[in-house]
Each structure stands twice: as C-alpha cells, then as structure tokens.
Regions:
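N-terminal pro-sequences and low-complexity stem/linker regions of secreted or lumenal proteins
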Residues: 2-297
Length: 297
C-alpha cells in the first residue's frame, strides 16, 4: 500500500498530468518530499487542516468500503416490522433496499440535494424507529420524487478519489450528525461544539439555518478563541464571505461561500464590517446614479 505522501503525489499527477505537480506551491512540493521520522506521532504535527463537507451520509459514500460498519454491519438496528433498517417501506407499502447510484451511466450527480432540515430529519428518525426515510426524504424535483433516492449510494468505481483517500488514511465509521438538523446547526457544532448560547435546556437550541445569521448574531465562545487562549494560531480559507463581495455570473456559482461558514455570524468577529464588504458597498454606491438614470429613461 502506498504511503500517504506517495498517494498525494500520485493524486496530483493523475489529476492533471505532470504539469499539475509543477503548479503546486514550492512549500507544498517540499512538504510532500519530506518523509516523517520513524516513531513520530500526531503529537509531532505542526498544522491541522479541517475541511467539512455536507449533504452526504457515511453510508452514501463509504457504505461498501471494506472493514467499516457499512451495509454489512452485523449490528444494524431492526425496524418495528422486524426488517433490518436497510429495508425501508413507504406509505404505499413498497419496500426498497440500498442501491448503487451509477455516476457513469445515470444522472445521479444531478439528482440535487434531498431534504435535510430539522423537521424532516426528526420525521425520518420517527422517535427512534428510523422507518420514514422514503416518505420524508423525497426529492424536491417532481421528476425524481417517486424514486427512492435516499437509499442510493456510491461505490469505489463512482468516487475513486474518495476511496483512495480512505485507503491511504484512517477512516472513522459510525458517522452521524452532531445535530439532527441541517447546515448551519451542524457547522455551529464544528466551530463551537454546541448550538446554544448557554449550556442549559432553558437556552434556545438553534436548530434551523435561519436561527443564526447576520440578522441574528451568536455570541458564545468559539474554538478559534479557545485556540488563541492557548497561544495556538488559526486561519480560515474561503473565497468570499456570505455577504456580497462582487462575484458575478459563474464566479458566484463556483467560488461563493453559500453561507456555509457560520463563524461569520458571531458578533465578536465583526465580519459585517470587513474591508472587502465595505469596498463592495463603495463600488455599488458609485454605480447607483448611473443605474437610477438608466431606470428613468
């Protein structure tokens, strides 16, 4: 089996030929050329990179990966009808098992996101019965709504890059949402470990995406602040803020942040007053007289 560094080198080469390797920054090339000393552990790491992706379950991506608690889980829960949880029944009485979403020969990549908010997550769980996935996780696309897409998964042939990562690095199974909700609450957990202002049941649980944003700022302590308290530096890398920054047309489609970083909505970071947003507002103000004149013609 390739070492992790060998894997990363090959991935860079296979992704776009030898030229891609040459395009990597010198610092990255240098880092990939360094072999870790024997006997080193994670305690010797100087940098930790955290990337959060969403809208896909562990089984959806790695349910067929060898050695994990996936679709061959010997301890899968049993539904009230005595079937294993993999055999889901809808309101019409039809039963569906997990099936492969063939990326090459189907339109699986265009199926769009299935419902994944507080209400339908709780409804699918159904008081711990886990038996309403087909009814409450239907596609919002009318063409796809009758399809049991929530039971679909990818395998190694569909997402070889992810499986190569899984082969080269440690994979943790038993993945689940920190909060049985949607994007913002789970990203709040990533940044803070909670969805509440105070660790008390009297404190509101922010379980909906709209509960925390620029109009409803959060104030509790975040992990970056805790890092600073321990003299550990940190950085956030993203193309733009969730505020308008001037991207246009396809730039917005490919480079926008899509409100996926709720750290922006904590009052202590003052992101609303960022330099980039102020420049955008100034540019818009200069264009406003021309836009008004065009409308008056």
């Amino acid at each position: 089996m390739d070492s992790r560094r060998d894997f990363l080198k090959k991935a860079a080469l296979l992704s776009g030929g030898a030229s891609l390797w040459d395009m990597l920054p010198d610092s990255i090339q240098k880092a990939l050329e360094i072999n870790p000393p024997q006997g080193s552990t994670y305690l010797d790491a100087e940098h930790i990179v955290v990337l959060m992706q969403e809208n896909r379950s562990f089984d959806h991506c790695f349910g067929t990966l060898r050695g994990v608690r996936g679709y061959n889980d010997p301890r899968a829960i049993t539904l009230p009808n005595k079937n294993l949880v993999w055999l889901q029944k809808n309101a019409a009485g039809d039963t569906y098992a997990p099936f492969r979403l063939d990326i090459k020969d189907t339109k699986a990549t265009w199926m769009s996101a299935l419902p994944h908010s507080w209400e339908n997550q709780v409804d699918a769980r159904n008081d711990g019965k886990y038996d309403r996935w087909l009814d409450v996780k239907k596609s919002g696309n009318k063409e796809y709504a009758p399809m049991p897409l929530t039971m679909g998964y990818y395998n190694r042939a569909d997402i070889p890059f992810y499986y190569a990562f899984a082969d080269a690095f440690t994979v943790c199974d038993q993945h689940f949402c920190s909060s049985l909700t949607g994007t913002t609450p789970n990203r709040l957990y990533l940044w803070t470990g909670t969805v509440r202002e105070k660790p008390s049941i009297e404190s509101k649980a922010n379980v909906r995406n709209s509960d925390v944003d620029y109009d409803d700022l959060a104030h509790w302590t975040t992990f970056p602040e805790r890092l600073e308290d321990n003299n550990i530096s940190w950085k956030i890398y993203q193309n733009e803020l969730s505020l308008p920054m001037g991207f246009k047309n396809e730039e917005e489609d490919w480079l926008a942040n899509f409100t996926d970083n709720p750290i922006e909505w904590f009052s202590q970071y003052h992101v609303r007053f960022s330099t980039g947003f102020q420049k955008f507002l100034a540019a818009q103000a200069k264009e406003l007289p021309t836009e008004i004149a065009d409308l008056e013609q």
